[in-house]
Amino acid sequence: MESFILLFTNDKLLIFNFIIILLFIKSLSYIIPLIIAIAYLTLIERKIIGSIQKRKGPNIVGIFGLLQPIADGLKLLLKETSLPNSANIFIFIIAPILTFFLALCAWAIMPFNEINFYSNLNIGILYLLAISSLGVYGIIISGWASNSKYAFLGGLRSAAQIISYEVSIGLIIINVLLCSGTLNLKEIVLAQQNIWYIFPLFPLFLMFFISSLAETNRSPFDLPEAEAELVAGYNVEYSAMGFALFFLGEYTNIILISAVSTILFLAGWLPPFDIFLFNWIPNSIWFGFKTIIILVLFIWVRAAFPRYRYDQLIQLGWKIFLPLSLAWLMLTSGILLSYDGFPN
């Protein structure tokens, strides 16, 4: 028996293939639930917006419209992909794939509880910032490769918008890192066992949430795809699965930034009170519940607020959020140095 085991353990190629298969299965265990969550997030969004606007929302396909996301997915999957004659075909096809792939890569380090995560990086925050910075390239090259002035302007707007608000997001995150003393997402959550960072850093949470709206091109900052000005922006020439991949990438980033907000400010999977009833609830349920609250805020803002002008958007980022986040960074540093941590 031992010789039989050694025969296989010495076969490095077999071990390598086995590891690759395990990683593939583990990746699918993240990707498939995420795609299902995106599908039903669109249904919830349409229902909530319909309710705010005194409409019913989707209610024909299935009971209460529960099969509507499946119908929409099948429609996009079965439609013919139309390629513009004047487009750079290779880059045109690669752009939505790159956007969705980078959005998925960011989920590799997200901890849903103390033990359930794909990879526990000690520099998890830096990894997230790097991936979010790369995500804009898919949008830029899609606008350029489409050879359309509307798509190109949408890509330029998106690049300027994301770069503008990444600066303030980075400074806000530094405040959280100073308070927690770590770049590890799991340890940031555990550092909030005494107090959630949303309470001492509530103004920063508001700025982070508003900056997240701009970072994900969501209303009222959806200027890169403003229908009245740019038809549909950078994805105006896309149809079928190309459009679907951009759509999946956008909503993947929305769920991701909601999960990051939960980790940085709402103590991730930790219950609000240390009582038996709350401790009995699985940690992943708490994490999902808090993330859903942030997602509902995203949807409510889309339904309630009009779109900003582009100059107002840029001025908000550079003239208001950047100075405020810098000032709060100095304030946080001073308090932590004076009291050797948060004052009691």
Curated annotation (Swiss-Prot):
Family the UniProt entry places it in: Belongs to the complex I subunit 1 family.
Organism superkingdom: Eukaryota
Pfam families: NADHdh
Keywords: Electron transport, Membrane, Mitochondrion, Mitochondrion inner membrane, NAD, Respiratory chain, Translocase, Transmembrane, Transmembrane helix, Transport, Ubiquinone
GO cellular component, one term: mitochondrial inner membrane
Catalytic activity: a ubiquinone + NADH + 5 H(+)(in) = a ubiquinol + NAD(+) + 4 H(+)(out)
GO biological process terms, semicolon-separated: aerobic respiration
Function text: Core subunit of the mitochondrial membrane respiratory chain NADH dehydrogenase (Complex I) that is believed to belong to the minimal assembly required for catalysis. Complex I functions in the transfer of electrons from NADH to the respiratory chain. The immediate electron acceptor for the enzyme is believed to be ubiquinone.
Location in or out of the cell: Mitochondrion inner membrane
The protein's enzyme class: translocase
InterPro entries associated with the record: NADH_UbQ_OxRdtase_su1/FPO, NADH_UbQ_OxRdtase_su1_CS
Major subcellular site: mitochondrion
Signal peptide start and end residues: none
Record GO terms (molecular function): NADH dehydrogenase (ubiquinone) activity
EC identifiers of the protein: 7.1.1.2
Protein name per the record: NADH-ubiquinone oxidoreductase chain 1
Transmembrane segments: 18-38, 58-78, 89-109, 123-143, 159-179, 195-215, 228-248, 253-273, 281-301, 316-336
Membrane topology, as annotated: Multi-pass membrane protein
